[in-house]
A protein has these predicted regions:
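Hydrophobic alpha-helical packing residues
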Residues: 90-94, 261, 400
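Alpha-helix initiation/capping motif
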Residues: 3, 145-148, 167-171, 196, ...
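Conserved NTP-handling cores and scaffolds of large molecular machines
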Residues: 25, 41, 47, 182, ...
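A conserved structural/catalytic subdomain of Rossmann-like adenosyl-cofactor enzymes
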Residues: 5, 285, 289-516
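Conserved, well-folded catalytic cores of nucleic-acid-processing
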Residues: 20, 162, 181, 185, ...
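Non-catalytic, mostly N-terminal accessory regions of nucleic-acid modification and defense proteins
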Residues: 1-206, 210-211, 215, 273-282, ...
C-alpha cells in the first residue's frame, strides 16, 4: 500500500470511528474527545519511543512504575516537556477500558498528572491545561457513570484500533495528518464556526509560501489569530525544519481552539521549546510585543471582528495603530489585525493575511489606513481568491501581502478568482493553481486579465482603492463574432430563403392550376 493509499484508508477509518463513537451527540460538541484521545495516544507512543531509545528489548509500557528513578523522570521532562508513567500509557489504559468501572476518574487523574509533571520546568506553560476540554464528567458522554465510561471506552478502543504502524518519522506524519483531517472535517460540518479556527490546507499552503517566499532562513513564524495552528504548520510542511530557526508562535482567543493548536504542534512533532502559543485577545492584550520582530507572519483572522475602538482611548496611542493615525472601524477590525501584523514584522519580513474584500474599497477610516500602507510602500500584492474556498463563507476573500523590503513602489494585483476546482460542497485550490499564482508573484510580470503591477501614483490617484477589479481587467468571456463570416452566413441564408419562396410560389401555382 502506498503512503497516499495508507493515508486515505486511515482517514476513512478515523472518520467512521469519530461518527460511530459520538452516538447522538453533535460531532462539533464531541470533537475534543476524539482529538484529545488521538493526542493522548500520540504523546504516549512518542514518549515510549524516546525512553526506549531504539533498544528493542525495552518495552516501556510493560515496565512497572517503580523502576522509574527521579533522574530518569527529570531528564525526560527536560527533553520532552512532560512525563508519563508506564501505567498511564495509552495502550495500557485502552486495553482495560471496557472493564474499568472508574475509567472516567482514572483518565482525569492521568491527564492531570501529565500536565502537573511539567510544573516548575520550562515546558510548564506549553503543557498546562492541554486536557482542560476533555471533561470526563460531561453529560455529553452520558447521564450515568456507566454510560460515560462506556462512551469513553468506545473512543479509546476506536483510536487504539487505528493502524499507524511503527512509531517512526513517517508514521509521526500520519498522526499529524489524521489530526488535521479530523479538524478539517469537523470544521466543514460546523460551517461558520468551523471556519473561524481552521484554514483549508491548500489555502494555508499558498499563504505559507507567500510569507516565506525567497527566504533561505527565517528567525520564526507568527500567526496572531492562529486557530488550530494549521497555517503555522503548513510552513513546517512546505520548508525544511532548519529554515525556521526559532520556531512557531501564535495567539488564540478561544480557549478550546488554543488547546487544539498546542496539541497540533505536538502531533506534528514540534517540541515544546520550538513553539509558543498564547491565549488571549491579540488586539487588546497582545503577546510577543517585546520579542524580536518576526521574519514571516501568516494569518486568517476572524472576519469583521469587533474592536473596542473609540471605547478604549488607549488604543489610538498603541504603537501598533498610532502610525496610521486612525483606528479600524469598531465593527470591522480587519485592518487592526493588518496593522498589528505590520508592527510585528521584521525589516526583511513578509506577511500574508486573509482579508474580506470590503476593506479594500470602503471609505472612512479604512481608506485612511490604506493610504498609510500604500504611502509607506508596505503593500506588495493583493490577491483575490475564488468564492467558496473557506468553511463558513461563500464570499471570495483576498490575501494581502505586506513587505518591508520592497525594491520598487509598485503594488501588484492578482486576480485568481477563476482558479478553482468545483467540488461537492466547496471549491478547491489545486497545486497547479498555487504554482500559477506563485510564478507571477515572483516575476511581478503583467499578464492580461490575471496580474498587473500598478505604479504608486495610479493607486494614489484612485483614492487608494486596492480592489483588484480596479486594476486587472476581467476577461470578456462572450463569444467573439467573426463579422465577415456572419455576413457570408447571412447572404447564404437569404439566398436559401429566396429559393424556398420561389419553390413555394411554384407549388401554389401548380395547386391553383389543378383546381381550375
Amino acid at each position: 500500500m502506498t503512503s497516499t493509499q495508507q493515508r486515505a484508508a486511515l482517514q476513512r477509518q478515523i472518520w467512521a470511528i469519530a461518527n460511530d463513537v459520538r452516538g447522538a451527540v453533535d460531532g462539533w460538541d464531541f470533537k475534543q474527545y476524539v482529538l484529545g484521545t488521538l493526542f493522548y495516544r500520540f504523546i504516549s507512543e512518542n514518549f515510549a519511543t524516546y525512553i526506549e531509545g531504539g533498544d528493542e528489548s525495552v518495552k516501556y509500557a510493560e515496565l512497572t512504575d517503580s523502576v522509574i528513578t527521579p533522574e530518569v523522570k527529570d531528564d525526560a521532562i527536560k527533553t520532552k516537556g512532560y512525563f508519563i508513567y508506564p501505567s498511564q500509557m495509552f495502550a495500557n489504559v485502552a486495553a482495560r477500558a471496557s472493564t474499568n468501572e472508574s475509567l472516567n476518574t482514572d483518565l482525569a487523574a492521568i491527564f492531570a498528572a501529565i500536565e502537573s509533571s511539567a510544573n516548575g520546568y520550562p515546558s510548564e506553560q506549553d503543557i498546562k491545561g492541554l486536557f482542560a476540554d476533555f471533561d470526563t464528567t460531561s453529560n455529553r458522554l452520558g447521564n450515568t457513570v456507566k454510560d460515560k465510561n462506556g462512551r469513553l471506552a468506545s473512543v479509546l478502543r476506536g483510536v487504539a484500533g487505528l493502524d499507524f504502524g511503527d512509531f517512526n518519522d513517517s508514521h509521526i506524519d500520519l498522526f499529524g495528518d489524521a489530526y488535521e483531517f479530523l479538524i478539517s472535517n469537523y470544521a466543514a460540518n460546523a460551517g461558520k464556526s468551523g471556519g473561524e479556527f481552521f484554514t483549508p490546507q491548500q489555502v494555508s499552503k499558498l499563504i505559507a509560501r507567500l510569507a516565506m517566499h525567497g527566504q533561505s532562513s527565517i528567525n520564526k513564524i507568527y500567526d496572531p489569530a492562529c486557530g488550530s495552528g494549521s497555517l503555522l504548520l503548513q510552513a513546517k510542511k512546505q520548508f525544511d525544519a532548519h529554515i525556521i530557526e526559532d520556531g512557531f508562535f501564535g495567539q488564540e482567543l478561544n480557549h478550546t481552539t488554543y488547546n487544539l493548536a498546542r496539541m497540533n504542534m505536538f502531533l506534528h512533532n514540534v517540541n515544546y521549546d520550538k513553539f509558543n502559543i498564547e491565549l488571549g485577545d491579540t488586539l487588546i492584550e497582545p503577546h510577543f510585543g517585546d520579542d524580536k520582530p518576526f521574519d514571516a507572519i501568516v494569518s486568517n483572522p476572524p472576519y469583521s471582528f469587533k474592536l473596542a475602538g473609540s471605547d478604549d482611548p488607549t488604543l489610538i496611542n498603541d504603537d501598533r495603530f498610532a502610525p496610521a493615525g486612525v483606528l479600524a472601524p469598531k465593527s470591522k477590525a480587519d485592518f487592526a489585525f493588518v496593522l498589528h501584523a505590520l508592527s510585528y514584522l521584521s525589516s526583511k519580513g513578509r506577511a500574508a493575511i486573509v482579508c474580506f474584500p470590503g476593506i479594500f474599497y470602503r471609505g472612512g477610516a479604512e481608506q485612511k489606513i490604506r493610504r498609510y500602507l500604500v504611502d509607506n510602500n508596505y503593500v506588495e500584492t493583493v490577491i483575490s481568491l475564488a468564492p467558496n474556498l473557506f468553511f463558513g463563507t461563500t464570499i471570495g476573500v483576498s490575501i494581502l501581502v505586506l513587505s518591508k523590503h520592497k525594491t520598487d513602489t509598485n503594488t501588484q494585483f492578482i486576480d485568481a478568482s477563476g482558479l478553482f476546482k468545483k467540488e461537492t460542497n466547496n471549491n478547491a485550490l489545486l497545486d497547479s493553481h498555487i504554482e500559477q499564482i506563485m510564478q507571477v508573484f515572483e516575476s511581478k510580470e503583467n499578464v492580461d486579465h490575471f496580474a498587473q503591477s500598478v505604479p504608486f501614483e495610479q493607486v494614489a490617484a484612485n483614492d487608494y482603492n486596492l480592489s483588484i477589479s480596479s486594476y486587472v481587467e476581467a476577461k470578456d468571456n462572450r463569444e467573439v463574432l467573426d463579422i465577415a463570416q456572419l455576413n457570408a452566413d447571412l447572404k447564404t441564408t437569404v439566398t436559401r430563403i429566396d429559393q424556398l419562396r420561389r419553390d413555394i410560389d411554384a407549388i401554389v401555382a401548380e395547386i391553383e392550376g389543378e383546381e381550375l
